[in-house]
C-alpha cells in the first residue's frame, strides 16, 4: 500500500476526497498529493520518510478552514502499523482564491513509513 493510500484510509469521513489530481468540480473537495520525501537512511533501516500535501478547496472560507482543522486533527501525530508518525510541517497555509473564486488551503506533512 502506498503512503497516499494509507493517508486516504485515515480520511474516510472526508467527502469528495481525491488522490493525485484535484478536478475542476466539485467546488468543495480535498486532494492528497505525494510530494516526495527524504532518502532512506543508509544505516539499513526499512523506514522511508515520505512527504505529502493535502489541498482543500471550498466555496466558503469558514467551512473550508474548519475542514482543514478537522483533517489536521485526524493526521497530525497519528500512527498506524505502516505510518509510524505523521507530522504537520507547515501549519494550514491560506493559498487565496482560485480563478472561480473558491478558497484554497494546503497542509504539508512528513511521516515515517514502513513497507
Please state what every model-predicted region is:
Residues 1-44, 62-73, 78-84:
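Small/polar-rich, solvent-exposed N-terminal microdomains that initiate assembly or binding
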Residues 1-9, 24-25, 37-49, 85-115:
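Short, charged interaction patches at domain edges and termini
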Residues 52:
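Residue-level detector of short, conserved catalytic/binding motifs and their immediate flanks
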Residues 55-57, 112:
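Short hydrophobic/aromatic beta-strand micro-patches
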Residues 59-62, 97:
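Short coil/turn segments at secondary-structure boundaries
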Amino acid at each position: 500500500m502506498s503512503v497516499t493510500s494509507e493517508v486516504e484510509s485515515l480520511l474516510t469521513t472526508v467527502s469528495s476526497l481525491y488522490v493525485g489530481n484535484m478536478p475542476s468540480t466539485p467546488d468543495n473537495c480535498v486532494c492528497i498529493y505525494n510530494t516526495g520525501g527524504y532518502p532512506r537512511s543508509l544505516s539499513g533501516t526499512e523506514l522511508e520518510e515520505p512527504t505529502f500535501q493535502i489541498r482543500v478547496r471550498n466555496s466558503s472560507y469558514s467551512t473550508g478552514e474548519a475542514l482543514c482543522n478537522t483533517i489536521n486533527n485526524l493526521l497530525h501525530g497519528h500512527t498506524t502499523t505502516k505510518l509510524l508518525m505523521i507530522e504537520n510541517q507547515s501549519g494550514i497555509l491560506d493559498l487565496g482564491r482560485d480563478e472561480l473564486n473558491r478558497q484554497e488551503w494546503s497542509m504539508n506533512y512528513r511521516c515515517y513509513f514502513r513497507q
